[in-house]
Amino acid sequence: MCIKAEKYIEWVKHCQCHGVPLTTYKCPGCGEQIMTQCSPEKEIRDSLTCCPWCSAVFFKQVKGAKVKASAVIQNQ
């Protein structure tokens, strides 16, 4: 397992231990499940994100527990 994936798993465990609300979505590059922090219900948070499994870079929008992810760059 790569360092990026290990750090991601540590982050998820930390969030779960501290009651941080998380939601799951699929990476647009590899289709693997990724967890991210929920936003307040009426707030949209967006960011460029890197998949911990395939390193694909994509644009992510989170509104409450709903996530929309669009591929930007995929490593070959």
From Swiss-Prot:
Sorted alphabetically, which keywords does the UniProt record give? Early protein, Host cytoplasm
Where it sits in the cell: the answer is: Host cytoplasm
What name goes with this protein?
Answer: Uncharacterized protein gp6
Provide the Gene Ontology terms for cellular component.
host cell cytoplasm
Q: Which organism is this protein's natural source?
A: Escherichia phage Mu (Bacteriophage Mu)
**Superkingdom:** Viruses
Please state, per the UniProt record, what induces or represses the expression of this protein: Expressed in the early phase of the viral replicative cycle. Expression of early genes is repressed by viral Repc (latency) and favored by viral Ner protein.
